[in-house]
Amino acid sequence: MPLVSPFRTSFGVETERDILLVRVELGTGDDLVEGWGECTALTEPSYSAEYVDGAQHVMERHLLPRLFHLPAITAADVATELSAIQGHPMAKAALEMAVLDAELRAAATSFADVLGVETTSIPSGVSVGIHESIDSLLAAVQGYVDDGYVRIKLKIEPGWDIDPVAQVRSLIGPSTPLQVDANTAYQRTDGHHLARLDEFDLLLIEQPLPEDDLLGHARLADEIDTPVCLDESLTSATVTADAIAVGACAIANIKPGRVGGYLEAVRIHDHCLAAGIPVWCGGMIETGIGRAANAALAGLPGFTLPGDISASTRFYAHDIVAEPIEVVDGQVAVPRSPGLGFDIDHAALDAATTNRSVERR
């Protein structure tokens, strides 16, 4: 699916999304109920080791055969049953998501209701990529402010950090929350440079160092005043607990696909809530399928910071859900329809589909 504009980060440029969807049919008595999952892997293994073609391969060759031998498949079984296969959390998450969606539809209940979410809407932030010029960046940010987004996140990298942040802070003023995301672009030796961002009163700096460098993040947290938030580093509840314990993680970005699914995402939320660590829900340029589920998840009480759950139109001119995600007065509604909170626009999906593969027991 083409993006409405190129989205550049420190690891590359996205102009379209090659999206892998999973559709399952679960038997409930005499009926079949469908469920949908969205794999958040990118086309290339740049954000993480996973990529779309690889995710499809591992699903077909290794993951689905292990699920098919079960007498009945439940969302709670997916992670345990697939634990013998190392890695591939995004592929596993897409399968769990599809099964969970089907289970909830069969029970005629919503994900938000099962989670006990009480709020009716969540604040919406927007992620702004690296631009060709400061003028282009400022025009984009002003447009998002005009659209009502309550928090701005800027992608940064060496050579595109201090000046863009200074210019954007001047544009939006001191009261609008502003944060930056480095996507692992810096090294331990960059602490003095990153401390120059402190004067801009940032909400956080996200994943400044490589994902495996928890100690480096802990040391950086002592060098700068801006809170350090982890993204790529947090792959499970266990790793999250370790990161918090060593002082590497003052704030957590929870992405269900990155951690293996929504059930693990809830466990991470619960641990962070108990530890007093604020969390927010990150984005992977999802369609309305993933955005709806994320909006329900982000209604949990530990999600105290605005996430990257923006409107469908932030990235796509035409979404593949019947009711695209909208931002109204800076808020996204928490979906309450059965399942994960969306219905498929089959005409739009058919128009965007490039190939199909069917796997059966």
Question: What kind of region is each of these model predictions?
Answer:
Residues 150-158, 179-184, 201-212, 227-235, ...:
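Catalytic beta/alpha-barrel core
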Residues 212-229, 234-331:
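Shared catalytic-loop signature of beta/alpha-barrel
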